[in-house]
Structures are given as C-alpha cells and as structure tokens.
Amino acid sequence: MKVWMAILISILCWQSSAWAVCPAWSPARAQEEISRLQQQIKQWDDDYWKEGKSEVEDGVYDQLSARLTQWQRCFGNETRDVMMPPLNGAVMHPVAHTGVRKMADKNALSLWMRERSDLWVQPKVDGVAVTLVYRDGKLNKAISRGNGLKGEDWTQKVRLISAVPQTVSGPLANSTLQGEIFLQREGHIQQQMGGINARAKVAGLMMRQGNSDTLNSLAVFVWAWPDGPHLMTDRLKDLATAGFTLTQTYTRAVKNADEVAHVRNEWWKAKLPFVTDGVVVRAAKEPESRHWLPGQAEWLVAWKYQPVAQVAEVKAIQFAVGKSGKISVVASLAPVMLDDKKVQRVNIGSVRRWQEWDIAPGDQILVSLAGQGIPRIDDVVWRGAERTKPTPPENRFNSLTCYFASDVCQEQFISRLVWLGSKQVLGLDGIGEAGWRALHQTHRFEHIFSWLLLTPEQLQNTPGIAKSKSAQLWHQFNLARQQPFTRWVMAMGIPLTRAALNASDERSWSQLLFSTEQFWQQQPGTGSGRARQVIEWKENAQIKKLGSWLAAQQITGFEP
C-alpha cells in the first residue's frame, strides 16, 4: 500500500510540475508554436529515417521532441509520439520491440525495483535498434526497429558488419535476438565526450545506398534474447560463446537503486567501446515473446544520464552594467539541471554579442557548463514565432561614472559596491549583491562609501538583512577602516593592478595626487595608455570628492 501511495504522490508531483511550466500563450499562439515545431521535427524525422542523415544533434532532437510533447499536453492537442519513425518498414519482427520506459530519477527507479527480483543493469548503448534472426546456425535476417512491429530489411547491410557473428551454434542456432547497432569507439568517456551524434551516424551508415567499407566501424550489443534461457547467467554465457561478448562484459547483477547508481556513475566516467546515454535495469524473468508489444514492457526501465548540454527556454533578457561601465547581457532561463547544478541564468556577453546571437524571450537555447562550472550558450536551437527583444540601455557609462548614486546609475553603482566588498579589495565577508541592494534601497547611499556611516541599529532594521547577520556586517564595516591605503585606492577603481600599485610605493592620498604620468609609466606593467588613465582617474571630480570624504573619516593614508 505504501508503495502505491508513493507512486501516486510521484505522479501528482510530476503533473504539478508539468502544469507549472506551461507557457502563458493564447490558443492561437499555442497552435502556431506547436505547429512550427511539429513541422521541424517531422522534417528531421524524414531526413533521419528516409535518408539516413541528421541536421540536428541527437540530444537536441530528443529534448525538443520532449518540449513539443509538453506543449501538446499543456494545450490539449496531444498526437502520436513524435519520435515514432515513419511506418515504411514492411518486414514483420518475429518478436516485437517493446521500447523502454524512462525513470525520472533514482527515487522512481527505487520504487520500480522494490517489487522485483533478479535484476540486472546494462549500459543503454546509443545507436539504432535491430532484430537478428538466426536459422539453422546462420544469420537469416536483420530488421530495423521501425515501429516495433515492422521494420526495414537490413540483412545485406548487417552481413557486411564483421563484428556481427554470421554463424552461431548451440542454443542460438535458431534464435531471435534484439540489440543495438553502435559505432565502435576506443576508450569513449561519456562524461567528457558526450554523445558525438552517434545515433545519427549509425542511422546514416545503415540507410545509405550501396555497400560501404565503413560498415566495419559498427558492431552490435545484444540486450534481449526473447524466449532464451531462464537464468541470466546462462543467457550471458551462451551469448559470449556465440561471439556476443560485450553483453556478458557489461551486464551486472544489482539489488537496489544505490548499486545501479554506482554502476551508472562508473560507466559515465569509464573508457567504453561505445557511446551510452544511461543504463537499463531489467528483470531476468520475462514474459513469453508472444506477449511482447511496443510500449508495454514492465520488466525493464531506463535511467538516462543528464545531458552534457540542456535545451533551456529563455524567459527574459536582462542588461547589467559592470563597475567599469560596460553593459553585459544576461539571459534568464527556465531552470535546467547540468551536472547537479541548477542553471537559471547564462551570461551572453556584450550587447553586440547578444545581437549576433539574436536571442529573444521564448527562444530555446542549448546550454552547457564551461570551465569551473560556468554556464555558457552553445547554440540557439529554436526561435519562437513571436519575438520581442528589449532595448538595451544607452551606452552612457564608463570607468569614471557612478561613484555617486542616481537613478540612471543604479546598476553600475551596485556593481561598484559588489567589487569593493570582494575578497581582493576590502574583504567584506557576508555581503553580496542582494545585500548591497537591500542596504542601498533602505538607506539611500550618497556614494560608494556611505555604508561606513551605518549604525548597528540601522543595519538591524534593514529589510532583507537578518538581525543575526547585522552585527556581523557592522563588525566587517568597522574592520574595513583598518585596511591599508592601497586597498581603499583599489576600492575607488584606480586603473592599476595591485602589483603595479604596490610597486609604486604610493602610501598616501596627497602623494598619489601629485604623481605624474611619467612616474606611472615607469611602474611594471604600466604603459603610456594606462598611465594616462591613472591621471584622468585621479583628476576626476568624483574621485577627489571621495578622497576628501575618506580623509574626514580618518581612513589611513587619506588624512591631510
């Protein structure tokens, strides 16, 4: 009873999450968006199944197909499974291909495993499914998966794949096998290399007219032997003896979802002879083959890997002004998971770069993680029917603007506060962008150092700042007064590296104000252009005003 309640709760949670992400479209807009994507996927299907070519990455195709299904559910016009291939095959399968149900996560897999025994895990090899029919010890027929009941006659093609045994003996002499034709790889690490569009490459080779030597780059992984030996160990042994050795090598007994997760993670990082996109867990006990039907396999499930790249919907385009005045563009996304990281924003770059990408709210973009786990845009994979792009702010900012607060300076002013509080500048622990925004909104700072005047009571009464944190912040602000002169100058945005500033031996504001352009050119890593920037900076009226204010606060190095 508890198991069924858990399953019911899971279904309800899934339905709730599905409803929550339905687009806020009018019926007419929904019809247009669904129709456009449906036509594109149909075109990709035709290219893939009729001509053996693919204009889209496998992962992008899968995710956009899932997105289409989601939209159809949202607006009540579900049709057939868009991933079902055209019904061109005329050859009946001796045993139907059932397909495999996908598990959403480890918890769902655990629920499924709880009521079953004698379970085994195999890699979910990424290729194209095939039926191999042996009669009197010889390969009699090879049939593509097709719609699960009928497929194409691939016999002549498969006979040219040297890795597929053409003759067998013993229990396999008169047998029907189901498996995956895959692209042979040497030391393929899924975590690092991804899917490499393996499925489309295999389909292309099998669909191509004429015979090709490149078929020898293919092999087969047998994952089912309908009506074979009852014991999995016997099945694996007989398959290995017949030449299907990979099945025995990559089939392991498992007792629970933790063990499956361990193997799944191992294969995700290991060097394998094929591309995979997850694992399949199957029960050794299977029904008689005459009961096998497409979409009705209850004895096996798949737990796929999180894609290396995810298709994400752009919810909004936002503009940010950095401390130097440069405008950057950020895309807010419908949340996606990448390597256990929830990604909701991705930096596009400059306004020019955004215009080159041509990204608008409603578009679907491919996102992955670059070095140090930073999200990046790989491609725009689908553009919406209605595209309205926001107007970027005027480029009125530079490295000498927004030291003092104003309505037009809001973003650059906040960026300056975030910068001066960072570890490499004044080291104000415990406060980031959200905290600075809360303080500025409540206390209306005049300039970037106004926080030095905040009292413990003011901090304690700031909405968004926990009372337990306010005392810590006040302590941090007071400690900042003891920071060396060079740190304060860096907080003011002097256009120098810390190394160049330290080498200059400037230890007071008055000394720095009297420095010359020639003096700065003599410092390491400081050319004539940078030296001129320093002079412009120290002669700026806002900078001089800040220097005088810090002197009044008796900050070290600024005293008269």
UniProtKB/Swiss-Prot annotation:
Molecular function in Gene Ontology: DNA ligase (NAD+) activity
Key words, A-Z: DNA damage, DNA repair, DNA replication, Ligase, NAD
Protein name: DNA ligase B
PROSITE patterns: DNA_LIGASE_N1 (PS01055), DNA_LIGASE_N2 (PS01056)
Domain of life (superkingdom): Bacteria
E.C. code: 6.5.1.2
Function: Catalyzes the formation of phosphodiester linkages between 5'-phosphoryl and 3'-hydroxyl groups in double-stranded DNA using NAD as a coenzyme and as the energy source for the reaction.
Residue numbers annotated as active site: 124
GO biological process, alphabetically ordered: DNA repair; DNA replication
One Pfam family this sequence matches: DNA_ligase_aden
Reactions catalysed: NAD(+) + (deoxyribonucleotide)n-3'-hydroxyl + 5'-phospho-(deoxyribonucleotide)m = (deoxyribonucleotide)n+m + AMP + beta-nicotinamide D-nucleotide
Family per similarity comment: Belongs to the NAD-dependent DNA ligase family. LigB subfamily.
